[in-house]
């Protein structure tokens, strides 16, 4: 290993970056597939309610439905700003 390879690490090529991004998109699509049709509307309405009290970004509210042993679990994550 030369000193140059230590000081200047190899950059990721665009193919590997594109592959990682595609994997994220596919994982997100798989998680929303098969979910109830009302989830996007529920997420938007929850975001509007939270915005009445706290300024948050569009991506601050995450709604998921998980199915475990015959039960559906509604999971709600809201990322609030510090302060």
UniProtKB/Swiss-Prot annotation:
List, alphabetically, the InterPro entries matched: MinE, MinE_sf
What family does this chain come from, according to its entry?
A: Belongs to the MinE family.
According to its UniProt entry, what is the function of this protein? Answer: Prevents the cell division inhibition by proteins MinC and MinD at internal division sites while permitting inhibition at polar sites. This ensures cell division at the proper site by restricting the formation of a division septum at the midpoint of the long axis of the cell.
Q: Tell me what this protein is called.
A: Cell division topological specificity factor
Q: Which UniProt keywords apply?
A: Cell cycle, Cell division
Pfam family for this entry, one: MinE
Q: Does the keyword Cell cycle apply?
A: yes
Single GO BP term: regulation of division septum assembly
